[in-house]
Amino acid sequence: MMLEPRPAARTLLFRVAERVYGCDIDSVREIIPYRRATRLPGAPPWVQGLINLRGTIVTVLDLGMRLDPARAPVRDGSIIMATQGTRVVGVAVDEVMDVQSIVAESIDTRADVGPQGLVSGLGHLHDGVVVLVSIHVLVTQVLL
């Protein structure tokens, strides 16, 4: 009996510093050019602040600073508008690269890296390893 292969995950690839990350494309609503956010007093350093996106106030997070607090904040690049239910959160990244399918068998979910389950696994592509980020966990951390 032959097992059917699991479907490939469509993944948005993006760069933060020198590392390539990815997230499930289904959690991405849109991508906009980077814009400066209004800082929130008392917010953690990885929360850049708020922007007004066509009349909707959106919290913008700095993924690089969330993963490495010593890193300089993103000041250029793009903001990935990610959705979790009815919530929209912006994720500031240095560069949005591509959308690729990652075969489920090439994803290692045992990877224990990143803060509080933020990294959901490592995906293996022909030209390297992609750190897969859980948008659900990232958004949940903001809501707490």
Where do the PLM segments sit?
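An acidic, low-aromatic, low-complexity terminal/linker signal
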Residues: 1-144
